[in-house]
Amino acid sequence: MVSAARGRRPKNLPIDSSVPDDIDWDHIPNHIACVMDGNGRWASRRGLPRTEGHAAGEVALVDAVDGALALGVGWITMYAFSTENWRRPADEVRYLMGFNESLLMRRADELNEKGVRIRFAGRRDWRVPRRVLKRMDESAELTQDNRRCTLTMAFNYGGRAEIVDAVRALVAEGAKADKIDEKAIRRHLYHPDMPDPDLVVRTSGEHRISNYLLWEIAYSELVFPEVLWPDFRREHLYESVLEFQRRERRYGGLES
């Protein structure tokens, strides 16, 4: 278990009265990764098109980032569009492409003002419209010097695809089999400097990984709140962090 000492909130963090009093400031996860699940079910329960669920999820994303900033989390990664999502109906895929483009148009300046660096992880293949790639590049360039928090949007991303791409890059370099180890593969991941997630939060109560950050989450703590993503708020993020703090991370070792 974590230490009974709760630490003190760093003075440089914004004051958020909704942060629980029992948060242990000495054990804040450095990297939180979120699977934003439940948009379709949220919409269906309200008799709305699935696309309305995706639209409603924007507020949840921004509030989760604000919550991460209030805790001093250095990295937060959002599963925005998976390599498997291409199998969804064409109308929904088109909507998601346009939605993510417009989301960046609406939110990039706001996130930049908050000191958030925006990055993207995933394949930049022919299926992703050029206008979307352009907007991604513009957002990344705008925020590249920010260091308060890094928001990585996993877009056209798959954990297996990332590992395959890393191995392909090694082969293309002419790497010999006996020289390929974990360090070599990590150097060829989409963002080698990104620390492994300490905490993975998947909303909607589903207990699955869904091909997300397979290499990086080997020793992550997993939390599965029942709330659907559009209803997710920073209070749910704080509850997930409290659950994380109640656990002892062993990394394959024995209980201390």
Language-model regions: role of each:
Residues 1-256:
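Flexible, compositionally biased loop and terminal segments
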